[in-house]
Amino acid sequence: MKISVKTLKGSTFQIEVDSAQKVADVKRIIETTQGQHIYPAEQQMLIHQGKVLKDDTTLDENKVLENSFLVIMLRQGKGSSSSAPATSKAPSNQAPPTQTVPAAPASQAPVAPATTVPVTVSAPTPTATASPAPAVAVSSEADNYGQATSNLVAGSNLEATIQSILEMGGGIWDRDIVLHALSAAFNNPERAVEYLYSGVPEQMDIPVPPPSIQPANPTQASQATQPAAPSILSSGPNASPLDLFPQALPNASTDAAGLGNLDALRNNAQFRTLLSLVQANPQILQPLLQELGKQNPQILQLIQENQAEFLHLINEPAEGDDEENLLDQFPEAMPQTIAVTPEENEAILRLEAMGFDRALVLDVFFACNKDEQLAANYLLDHMNEFDDEGPP
């Protein structure tokens, strides 16, 4: 019999199966027909009428009939985040080289298996070139692009993803719960579905202090008062803290406490950069405030005591006649050279492979505290602005 298989992005394909076949066999059929690099059987999760199908059960036992449809998603395997094309690694019998990568080189440099790799963040000159590097196959760049974009949705695709997840649940979830899971997963549909089945990690499920006045922006109000779904697990792919606040901010908190308001924070370039990210993507406000409470409770207390001024900071436009993006201030606030690990350098290359300028990628990557998914989400959400106005 023929059944349809839907993806979270809305695409559909058909496969020929037998009702007596086990779910594990169906996964292998999908792997064979669609490609092992796209849908590896061991990472597949098949869902029918809101139920995750077990490998040792048959289609008949799960009431999968002719012309039924399954929803497919991929589990985030341990090796998926660290995987990289073999051509990008140096031979193991050579001494680990150290490289300095310009902010916008003419060609990619190899990823070295050293513990840290210095990356120059300062603005490049048009003639800047990288040290000679072995050519990377075109197919590996395509793989990098797929890895960076396949798990994120934004813009018009977001509504289609919400509807797809609602259909997947077969009515067991309402829209608010799905939106909450997507918010906690930073618009990663696969991770959001995992949260719906296993619970949103405690680190991502926090209340925001209730404002004492009506916010100027209704969107900000809806984000601040969004109801929390039941939290079950304290572990998961997004369980690690976001550490969105750099080391320069503790001094700012001391100055701000002396003033009794947010003037010191208003003039802090890094804090202004974080505010610009919140303005662009209000969904990060909750985890940002949570991490602020962990790393600098004095600033969080100051924000709670000056909620009206904080809301004004969030809603006010960027300063300057040309309304320059606040990310322009980030290179001035950070050291000119920052050491990154090989894994972080691979993340930078994957973001570059999406077609963005390297200087822009570095600015956003470090502004998002080296969170690859958050940086990719920001770049995708604002790609039209970058095309029209150039990099910030």
UniProtKB/Swiss-Prot annotation:
Compositionally biased tracts (Low complexity): 214-231
UniProt-recorded name of the protein: Probable ubiquitin receptor RAD23
Domain Ubiquitin-like per the UniProt entry, residue ranges: 1-79
PROSITE patterns the record matches: UBA (PS50030), UBIQUITIN_2 (PS50053)
Function: May be involved in nucleotide excision repair. Binds and presumably selects ubiquitin-conjugates for destruction. Prefers multiubiquitin chains rather than single ubiquitins, with a binding affinity for 'Lys-48'-linked ubiquitin chains. Acts as a ubiquitin receptor that associates with the 26S proteasomal docking subunit RPN10 for the indirect recognition of ubiquitinated substrates of ubiquitin/26S proteasome-mediated proteolysis (UPP).
Source species taxonomy: Eukaryota, Viridiplantae, Streptophyta, Embryophyta, Tracheophyta
Alphabetically ordered keywords of this record: DNA damage, DNA repair, Nucleus, Repeat
Assembly description: Interacts with 'Lys-48'-linked polyubiquitin chains. Interacts with RPN10. Interacts with VP1.
Gene field: RAD23
One GO CC term on file: cytosol
Region (Disordered) residue spans: 80-109, 209-237
